[in-house]
Amino acid sequence: MASILTLDGLYAEVPKFLPEALREGCAGKKPLSFYIQQILNLMGCDGNEYHVLFTSSSEEANTHMIMAVVRRHLLRTQQRPHVIIGAAEPPSVTECVKALAQEKRCVYTIIPLKNFEIDPVAVYDAIQSNTCLACISGTNAVVKTFNKLQEISKVLGAIPLHSEMSDVVYQGCIKQHPPADSFSLNSLYGFLGVGVLGIKKKAMQGLGPLIFGGGLRGGSPNVPGIHAMYKTLTQQRPSIKKINTVHKLFMKILKKHQHVYLPIEGMSSNGMPSNGMPSSGIPVEGPKSLPGYILFSVGRSAEELQKKIFTKFNVKVGRIVNLQEVLFRIKIPQKYWETLLFIQLREDLTKEDIKRVMAILMYLDTVTPRGSLPPPSYSSSFS
């Protein structure tokens, strides 16, 4: 899957089957109920059955769900709650459950993969009298095979099943593999975007006060949902010094990993055309002004992506470089490609944008060219 993502968070090119508003990133321009209904339509869920809660990411959504269910169980009984998780769950699920277990707030069972998927029979065999939640994603994080969520939900009975569904949605398979009791999504409405936690109302009983305090349905300054994210992205501006730091580190990484660096004639940091920037793919040390854009294009649709980007931003086209083979050669996992696809070096980068980019670049600076990326992190040297 190829994506074009701008770091101002206001535009995104993602799979065509997604609704127009999700593709164009119109965050904050309509009432919150509009976006809630969009998510329900995207997932094929009935608005009378599901609550939709916007979060900063699917990682936050997963953590909220796990923490809330465990706490609800502890409020109801003295027995330590038991959580079932799949062997190929995302780190946000496994690390949260393991941390709770270390605090002696729960116990857990890991279901191994059988024929590259989670076997419903194995889930049934793992059920205990104190089982309060099962976390089985729509796809397995390692091999990207689909799990039979509806069958797993049936064997669980009244025990809620929480599923990370981002890969299922982005592969266009949500109709064939719908969620069960609750689901999480990531990176909607732009580069940083927002996450979603969807919960069936029958599973929501007693969870509302444990999620966002009162079970809020949208975002707030402390819970960056649609409107809060939009406000943050449009108001925060980093200094040009930080942008230059990112650029220098980017150049260093590109040379080390033998990527093709593409300075494209466009807008410099002061908003004027960046004269003197070469149109070749040869790295240049110490440019007089920042390039308007650095573009990485993955897959077959480079020309289409080129047209969309430069029509949108009125930037003169230089040359598009397809780096699919390069990405394979240095073994960057596909799920991190979008982080590297499109980096816009202009004054409208936000602090969070820079932190995300810097976390990736600083890691790449410490590994050999055959290394792979860690999970995205927002920690960096920038405060």
Swiss-Prot record:
Required co-factor? pyridoxal 5'-phosphate
Q: Name one GO cellular component term.
A: virion component
Record has Hydrolase as a keyword: no
Keyword Metal-binding carried by entry: no
SUPFAM superfamilies noted in UniProt = PLP-dependent transferases
Q: What induces it?
A: Expressed in the late phase of the viral replicative cycle.
Matching entries from InterPro entries are given as: Aminotrans_V_dom, PyrdxlP-dep_Trfase, PyrdxlP-dep_Trfase_major, PyrdxlP-dep_Trfase_small
UniProt: pyridoxal 5'-phosphate binding residues: 58-59, 184-186
What keywords were assigned to this record? Late protein, Pyridoxal phosphate, Virion
**Known Pfam families for this protein?**
Aminotran_5
Gene3D superfamilies hit by this protein: Aspartate Aminotransferase, domain 1 (3.90.1150.10), Type I PLP-dependent aspartate aminotransferase-like (Major domain) (3.40.640.10)
Say which family it is in. Belongs to the class-V pyridoxal-phosphate-dependent aminotransferase family. NifS/IscS subfamily.
Protein name (Swiss-Prot/TrEMBL): NifS-like protein
